[in-house]
Design a protein with these regions (language model features):
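N-terminal charged helix/coil linker that caps or initiates catalytic domains
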Residues: 1-26, 144, 164-165
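Glycine-rich phosphate/adenylate-binding loop
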Residues: 2, 109-115, 119-223
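Conserved N-terminal Rossmann-fold NAD(P)-binding element of oxidoreductases
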Residues: 27-29, 52
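Hydrophobic/small residue at the entry helix of a nucleotide-binding pocket
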Residues: 33-34
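Hydrophobic residues within alpha-helices
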Residues: 37-38, 81
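Aromatic pocket-lining residues of Rossmann-like dinucleotide-binding sites
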Residues: 41
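Glycine-rich phosphate-binding loop and adjoining beta1-alpha1-beta2 segment
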Residues: 46, 51-88
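A structured beta-alpha segment of the ubiquitous adenosine-cofactor-binding alpha/beta core
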Residues: 74-115, 120-126
């Protein structure tokens, strides 16, 4: 057991730590949610991360996106995340894809992955990723944030969770996000991911909803 992972034990067993080092995780989006997810999973020590984002950092990202900084403005988010990743855990293998998720590349991005993490900020992309995971038979960890609130869930093939949550005509009007909201949501997403990868019991098709303004938490079965 490498020294860097010793504080994961006994919360995780040594066998679980070794198991997750064999896993391949896709993270789509390297902004508010994605930056936190990538950092968490690097520190956990998953074996392989494929990180995807075609966007560049802008000034409006500085309030919440972990890998944003003044020097990073104008640079691709996935590329900057990869640079930071090497300083966090160089033992994790990285695939860096400086592209947006599209119908044309979705199945290629999912190839050989054990699970996909939704760190997107738009509904069409979220629906596209969910449909691709359904087709590939790969579980999806969903996360969404707005203002003070966030929600996360593990969706297995056949759940159709994203279709239920986001019909085609769904419109998001509030695009404000506070700095702590993506960190909270990403923590829940990462915990669902790690439990799935290590074979621990985990609820699927259940929304975990957090309201940090009113300190409220709800568990909402959806399937």
């Amino acid at each position: 057991m490498q020294e860097r992972y010793l504080r994961n034990i006994p919360a995780l067993t040594e066998e679980e730590c070794q198991l997750q080092q064999q896993k391949r995780v896709l993270v789509v989006g390297c902004g508010g949610l994605g930056g936190n997810l990538i950092s968490i999973l690097l520190r956990f020590g998953v074996g392989h991360l494929r990180i995807v984002d075609g966007d560049v950092f802008e000034t409006t990202n500085l309030n919440r996106q972990l890998f944003s900084s003044i020097p990073a403005l104008g640079h691709n988010k996935a590329r900057i995340a990869a640079q930071r990743a090497g300083n966090i855990n160089p033992d994790v293998a990285l695939d860096v894809v400086e592209e947006f998720l599209t119908e044309e590349n979705a199945q290629t991005l999912l190839q050989n992955c054990d699970i996909a993490l939704d760190a997107l900020d738009n509904i069409p992309g979220r629906r596209l990723l969910a449909a691709a995971c359904e087709k590939a038979g790969i579980p999806l960890v969903y996360g969404a944030i707005s203002g003070w609130v966030s929600q996360a869930a593990l969706s297995m093939p056949g759940d159709r969770l994203i279709e239920t949550l986001y019909p085609e005509d769904t419109v998001v009007r509030d695009k404000s996000v506070l700095s702590f909201t993506p960190a909270r949501c990403a923590s829940m997403q990462a915990s669902l991911c790690v439990k799935y990868l290590t074979g621990r019991p985990v609820e699927t098709g259940t929304i975990y909803y957090f309201d940090l303004l009113n300190q409220e938490f709800e568990t909402i079965p959806m399937v």
